[in-house]
Amino acid sequence: MKFQLNGRRSMAVLLASVRVVAAVGLIVPLLFAASVTAWLLACALAILLAGSLVRWGFLLLIDESHFIASTPGLRVAVVTSFVPGAESLPMLERTLAGMQKLCYPHDTWLLDEGDDDAAIELCARLGVRHFSRKAKAEYQTEQGQYQRGTKHGNYNAWLSEIGFANYDVLAAIDPDHVPGSNFLTETLGQLSDPRIAYVQSPQEYYNQPASLIARGCSEESRDFYWISQRAFHRFGSPSVIGAHGVHRMKALQAMGGLAPHIADDLLLTLRYQMSGWRGAYVARVLARGLAPVDWRTYVKQQRRWATSLFDVKFFLYPEMVQGMPFRGRVVGLLQGLTFLQDGVAALCCAMALAALLVAGVPASLASALASPPVLTSATILLLTGLYPHLFHGPHRNLTFHWRAGLLRLVKWPYTLLALADVIRRRDRGYALTAKVGRATADRSFLWPHVIICGLIGATWILAMTLGSIQHLLPHVAAVAAMLPSLFLVGSSFIPAPAAFDPMLADGHADAEL
């Protein structure tokens, strides 16, 4: 395995060098085209290629954790939360059953936000311990550590009441994530290093077959979980992921519990790094959960994530950076980079399209786009971009991730809206991703794409009326720009599958590889 990884790294060095040359060959002719449209296109490409170059740098830094036998005698609590009405009992039952089967002595806890009778009965039947803060006024605050209706408030109530005093290790698992029986045996050994505060593993989905959106979510997350996180492991700074992870209670207590923020996992990562703690990353699939299966859930989730990441990056990270080691600064700087680069690049492309439709195609731009250096460089970049897929753990292949590309084209307006929310300091509040029933018929979330199509269409018609379009390129660009929006609007009328499908869950009853 080590030999194969080193061999792939050597090839990555060669291909990265080729990509740098190809990037120059693609961008420089556009710069010399001497037109605003060409410069905007060059800017968008430079932003996207810079992000790609960072990912290729991560390929060279990938480090693998080694299996370490678990230390016997640890007091371990395996915990999940539950919000009645937003999360289904059949889904919860599979998660609790999986938690009970973990191969290390532990207590399983359910943190029930609603003190639900059916959840209490389920816990009694499975032998799971039940906790609810519903009747505890001291754990029901409007803001802060115990904010009502939030995951961090729910966990912090249990930690203060029970967890910190009675356990050495917290294994936190979201209610839709079914752990494999090896979840604890694969992770607890990493805590034998007293510097390690937390252990992470990749986030995978068992409902990928449910829809195009679910498969796209899996594709677009692979670079992060199988490349970036493994590179950060080398420096002891992988990101905490809220879906499932293991924490040393002593370290978590020193942080004050889960961070009171929508991006509690990112903020907790930065707090750990600022305090000198390290993390470990086990690059093996140890649990599988649910991905969004419909457009509304997906774009709302992405906007919420982008808003929380931007808030941490712009307002909290600058205050924390002075006390951080270099590795912590890098984590804080690079987290959310994809959201930002996609939004800014899309904005540059939108302005370039407007210039094409209004002012026409400069001869220098048409010549540059059809030149051999640009065409050759674009082909090289497209084909070599497949190589990082060989680092994607169980998903190693050389296929195009077109679904992930489609999702990126769909979500960029919501990324810019998230950026606007943060700049205006608009608090959109905490929102839970519902994992019960089917998507509603509400399509109000489509308005950004309806406006995009309307603006492009109106400008296109006006340009043709005025006779400013004398080249095929503006027509092709206008159609290409509207296609993702039209696809989103049209496909939103196709009935979406249920958020939770018992058959898919049972098909991945054990997440071990």
Predicted features and spans:
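The conserved acidic donor/metal-binding loop of glycosyltransferases
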Residues: 173-178
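N-proximal low-complexity "stem/linker" segments adjacent to membrane-targeting elements
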Residues: 1-97
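A conserved acidic beta->alpha catalytic loop
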Residues: 112-120, 124, 135-138
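Long helical/loop segments within the catalytic core of UDP-sugar-dependent glycosyltransferases
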Residues: 131-167, 181-263, 271-274, 295-337
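Membrane-embedded multi-pass helical conduit in multi-pass membrane proteins
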Residues: 25-47, 56-62, 68-71, 338-429, ...
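Catalytic donor-sugar/metal-binding loop of nucleotide-sugar-dependent glycosyltransferases
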Residues: 260, 269-288
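Short aromatic/hydrophobic "clamp" motif used to bind/position activated sugar donors
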Residues: 170
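Short, acidic, metal-binding catalytic loop of nucleotide-sugar glycosyltransferases
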Residues: 94-106
